[in-house]
């Protein structure tokens, strides 16, 4: 199987993210997120990736959200927001995206994401469910959630 690694917040990772910019979709760009983390000197990297040899071929940004901001889960609790996930075009259909999502699930906390780039089928296949849209809470997003046992959706 694939090894999912937490990516360091440094200029080498920024260089690797440039390859995604060349081939990837603008909506999935994580370059600005990484630059902000470098500036803030954030030691807890929210970025995870999979390498094929020495090439970063799949990545995701996964942010831990404090339970006091939880508007999705019952009981209210800390959860993860899987902000973005991307696999380079030549490496798709090889389960790299699945490995990243399973890594996020391994933390055992609920996960919220937004379906981007018409990826609804992928999120459904990964066991996520669409959330009933709430204008005040979702503000134009299309949220999907994954619930571990003993966690339910808020009404």
UniProtKB/Swiss-Prot annotation:
Keyword Acyltransferase: yes
Keywords per UniProt: Acyltransferase, Transferase
Protein name per the record: Uncharacterized N-acetyltransferase BBR47_38600
Start and end residues of each N-acetyltransferase domain: 7-154
Superkingdom: Bacteria
Any one GO molecular-function label of the UniProt entry: acyltransferase activity, transferring groups other than amino-acyl groups
InterPro entries (UniProt xref): Acyl_CoA_acyltransferase, GNAT_dom, YlbP
EC numbers: 2.3.1.-
Keyword set includes Acyltransferase: yes
Enzyme class name: transferase
